[in-house]
Amino acid sequence: MTYTVDTPRSRRRRLRWPRLPLGEGQAAWTTRALMLLAPLLSFTLVEYLNYNNPWTDFTPLQIALNLAWYYLGELFFYFVLRRRASAVKWAMGIAWGLGMANHYLISFRGRTLFPGDFLTLRTAANVAGNYDYRPDSMQWLTIGVFAAVLLALSFLPNEKKRPFPWRLFVPAAGAAAVYLGVFFGTGFVESRGIEPSMWKIGRAHV
């Protein structure tokens, strides 16, 4: 008679998280599609938290300028992590987190987060206890969407870390440099009647 010893390792094998049976090529195209679509969803969630409808409240130029930041952030994480699914998770998570912070700031102060606010963190910490931080229905909706995205990503096959993609990095870095130069170093944005620090805050204009 033989006996099977139930070890922690064997239990982990039985409880392995299910993965989609995708081939290497299928998984690659799936993560590429996610990298293309995720910034659109991130932009929608963030602007929804800012009390805006991004697809009707903004001009096409404003939408393009906003989306550029989301794609740049995602590319940054891709070059650092060298995994497409991980880049999607980190870029979306940080964008969503900033959207949540802005949602509170708009509710409390009527405006979004500005770079100068980081210089007054001590003052902000002193008054932070005076506010109600319970999530509202808008926040719960975005929490559900973000959680659903993370759950969907968890079913993808494990992704190997790729060699650094120099062939993609060089043109991406060049395009980013041009965009940042035009955005901050010229009057192009202001000449179109757009405030670089804040496109529009729906609730602040009510």
Task: Please report, for each region that a protein language model flagged, where it lies by residue.
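Conserved small/polar residues in nucleotide/adenosyl-binding loops
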Residues: 204-206
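Transmembrane and membrane-interface helices of multi-pass
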Residues: 2-202
